[in-house]
A protein has these predicted regions:
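A short secondary-structure junction motif
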Residues: 41-44, 74, 100, 104
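Short pre-active-site segment immediately N-terminal to redox-active cysteine/selenocysteine motifs
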Residues: 30-36, 41, 74-77, 89
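Flexible coil segments in periplasmic/lumen-exposed cytochrome c-class electron-transfer proteins
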Residues: 28-32, 80-110
């Protein structure tokens, strides 16, 4: 009987949804590497290139994939931060940025 309980616990952990730490990691990465130029989703260098939803869409960015590519490789005056953000960092920060843009940056920590 004990083995059955153990098996059920392991099965429950295996099929449980992934923890929501990607957003937390994205927020931490944003705070550490992006907020200097993009405080509250703005842009202190180029005012029209903010991280607000309207500006993202106007600049052809339709989701986190494009944001991750820009974070990794850079675009225009923005340098790429792929090495700084690490293997999954660009995806995590891009997901977080996209969530904030969807909420008009009202729920962000910055």
């Amino acid at each position: 009987m004990t083995w059955l309980v153990g098996l059920l616990l392991m099965l429950g952990l295996w099929i449980a949804p992934a923890p929501a730490h990607a957003a937390a990691d994205g927020a931490a990465l944003f705070e550490a590497h992006c907020v200097g130029c993009h405080l509250n989703g703005g842009n202190i260098i180029r005012r029209g290139k903010t991280l607000k939803l309207k500006a993202l869409e106007r600049n052809g960015i339709q989701g986190p994939l494009e944001i991750a590519m820009i974070a990794t490789e850079g675009r225009g005056q923005m340098s790429g931060y792929g090495e700084v953000l690490g293997e999954d960092g660009a995806d995590a920060v891009a997901e977080w940025i996209w969530q904030q843009a969807q909420n008009d940056w009202h729920n962000g920590s910055t």
